[in-house]
Amino acid sequence: MAYTSKLIEEAINEISALPGIGKKTALRLVLFLLKSNPEQTERLATSLHKLRSQIQYCQKCHNISDTTLCSICANPHRDTGLICVVENIQDVIAIENTAQYKGIYHVLGGLISPVEGIGPEQLYIEHLVQRVQQEQPQEIIFALSTTIEGDTTTFYITKKLKEFPVKLSNIARGVAVGSELEYTDEMTLARSIKERILYH
């Protein structure tokens, strides 16, 4: 694509580097921003700057947060006896959108994948073991993707937790095999959590 402005070209290149956005969509966004009220563009720029400079990760569960503890871990009304283990932050958002789960979370930061060179030591698995030891929850719910990587990660963690008197369960397989949690519709996800099965 040929552009009449170097600044527009630079903006398009940066925006199109975002996932799911091609050059044409980036061009539409750039032209929209140029036509927008200057204050709106400034608010967007300020918001993006704050996002990079102020967002942190919850010290307890590794969810994104504005403070050292995320709003879920800091909420006294959440059931701390239930810890839902998820792959990433998108999964926390997906489960929260069901409005059915009232426990807390533990974000692993990925899944065990020898093919991609990701081992247990690169994930927040040891921290989960520490939490179980210190917090003594009643149940750990595995809400990981129904993939080989998800099953491998679940199996590895259950072996690490077998010495603790905690119930281990999997969300029901209403979530299609091979699918990622964040793309599962809210009704199916809510039912999968409600109808979770004990891990054997």
UniProtKB/Swiss-Prot annotation:
It comes from the Bacteria. Keywords: DNA damage, DNA recombination, DNA repair, Metal-binding, Zinc, Zinc-finger. Gene3D superfamilies: 3.30.60.80, 3.40.1360.10, RecR Domain 1 (1.10.8.420). It holds the Pfam family Toprim_4. Belongs to the RecR family. NCBIfam families: recR (TIGR00615). This is Recombination protein RecR. It comes from Amoebophilus asiaticus (strain 5a2). The gene is recR.
